[in-house]
């Protein structure tokens, strides 16, 4: 259950960051504020959920799991904004996945 909460907190955080990226690309002032407001809501929810996670998961396991953000952001950037993923970046993401598996198995 704790790992599900970590993934959900990470997804909320990524959602907030993606809203910030969208706000940076939006030209209409009203839309910018909408994206920024949504970003604050998602990041606030992520923080509250993260505080709960820290009550139930050892810090030495929980914090490295935040590297899920790098994976989610990379995938979202690729599929939403069609940003290329260089070989070096892809290898880095694969290494992060290996690290998460190793840490998850050690917990």
From Swiss-Prot:
Cell location: Cell inner membrane
Protein name per its UniProtKB record: Probable 4-amino-4-deoxy-L-arabinose-phosphoundecaprenol flippase subunit ArnE
GO BP, sorted A to Z: lipid A biosynthetic process; lipopolysaccharide biosynthetic process
Main location: membrane
Stated role: Translocates 4-amino-4-deoxy-L-arabinose-phosphoundecaprenol (alpha-L-Ara4N-phosphoundecaprenol) from the cytoplasmic to the periplasmic side of the inner membrane.
UniProt keyword annotation of Cell inner membrane present: yes
Family, similarity comment: Belongs to the ArnE family.
Organism per entry: Enterobacter sp. (strain 638)
Membrane protein topology class: Multi-pass membrane protein
Taxonomic lineage from the root: Bacteria, Pseudomonadati, Pseudomonadota, Gammaproteobacteria, Enterobacterales
Oligomeric and partner information: Heterodimer of ArnE and ArnF.
GO terms, molecular function: carbohydrate derivative transmembrane transporter activity
Gene name linked to the record: arnE
Pathway: Bacterial outer membrane biogenesis; lipopolysaccharide biosynthesis
Domain EamA: 31-105
Keyword terms: Cell inner membrane, Cell membrane, Lipid A biosynthesis, Lipid biosynthesis, Lipid metabolism, Lipopolysaccharide biosynthesis, Membrane, Transmembrane, Transmembrane helix, Transport
Pfam families: EamA
A GO cellular component entry from the record: plasma membrane
Source species, domain of life: Bacteria
Residue intervals passing through the bilayer: 34-54, 57-77, 85-105
């Amino acid at each position: 259950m704790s790992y599900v909460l970590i993934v959900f907190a990470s997804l909320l955080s990524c959602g907030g960051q993606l809203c910030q990226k969208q706000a940076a690309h939006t030209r209409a002032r009203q839309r910018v504020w909408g994206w920024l407001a949504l970003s604050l809501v998602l990041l606030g929810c992520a923080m509250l959920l993260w505080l709960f996670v820290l009550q139930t998961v050892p810090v030495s396991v929980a914090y490295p799991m935040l590297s899920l953000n790098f994976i989610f952001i990379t995938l979202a950037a690729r599929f939403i904004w069609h940003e290329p993923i260089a070989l070096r970046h892809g290898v880095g993401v694969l290494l992060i996945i290996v690290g998460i598996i190793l840490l998850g198995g050690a917990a």
